A protein has these predicted regions:
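Bacterial extracytoplasmic/cell-wall-associated proteins, especially those involved in peptidoglycan
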Residues: 2-111
């Protein structure tokens, strides 16, 4: 079983926001989450297709999921630090994105 199987699609999306853009604050995490949603909407194989989870975990796309980068840290946040404020913020953004109510502040960007 993959170490990411314990997470829902929303959690994977939120952790991607944290892993890629935590240092940029809420706006940066929203931009990352927007790009994931835009890639899923584009449904391009090399970007992971139309599934949010697959887009996030597609090898070579979001560096935080690549082995040797931030992967262990973000998995740890998801499994043992549910109250970590950037993660809480990203979860709210991810829930809104999946519900279709998060504004796209990237103007359709995929990167």
């Amino acid at each position: 079983m993959s170490d990411t199987n314990v997470f829902s699609d929303v959690e994977i999306l939120a952790l991607t926001g944290v892993g890629e853009s935590e240092s940029l604050g809420e706006k940066g995490m929203q931009q990352t989450i927007n790009t994931v949603m835009n890639r899923a909407a584009a449904d391009v194989d090399w970007m992971g297709g139309s599934d949010v989870r697959t887009v996030c975990l597609q090898p070579g796309q979001y560096d935080c999921w690549n082995p040797g980068n931030d992967r262990d840290r973000i998995i740890s946040i998801g499994t043992s630090k549910p109250d970590y404020q950037p993660y809480v913020t990203a979860l709210g953004l991810a829930e809104s994105a999946v519900a279709g109510s998060l504004p796209d502040i990237t103007n359709g960007a995929v990167s």
